[in-house]
Amino acid sequence: MVVYDLLVSLSKESIDVLRFIETNLAAFNQQYIFFNIQRKNSIMTPLLITPQQEKISQIVEFLMDEYNKSNRRPGPPREQPMQAYPLLSYQQSSEEQPMMPYQQPPGDDDQPYEQIYHKKHASQQVNTELSDYYQHILALGDEDKGMDSMLKLPERAKRESDDEDDMFPIKKLTT
């Protein structure tokens, strides 16, 4: 019984510890991704960082530096990342005309005329194809009724292989 209580208390504590680690790992990963994106995109503008994020970023940088120091492999030094350059804003010349978004002509319908027309046309086409198909099937059924009375299997023509079959007669088993 004592062991059971001990296990229950340990499991509760371990769940709390795991939850704490999980929340901190999520914050750690978010901050790490945030800084990697900032470095890769060479963003020069200052970003709003809360004090908690700043502490996490300091911890992340310290851990990454320690990891890099302990796992450095001998060899030529790595290339330094390119220096960041601020992005220049796009200047539109006076000759260029600004692109206007497409505006639908005023009307009562929510859908353009072509879409409505194509939908109706397609449904009519499918209906006519289906009715033609069913008419064809019914016609085939009528033909089959007439054909059954006239249809007779042709007599089996004698082949060269029939002679070979006669050479090895099959005996019928009688019981």
From Swiss-Prot:
Keywords assigned by UniProt, alphabetized: Late protein, Virion
Keyword ATP-binding annotated: no
Induction (UniProt): Expressed in the late phase of the viral replicative cycle.
Residue ranges, compositional bias (Low complexity): 95-106
Localization (cell): Virion
Region feature Disordered, mapped onto this chain: 68-111, 154-175
Keyword Transmembrane: no
Similarity annotation: Belongs to the asfivirus H171R family.
GO CC terms: virion component
Disulfide bonds listed in the record: none
Chief location: virion
Protein name in UniProt: Uncharacterized protein H171R
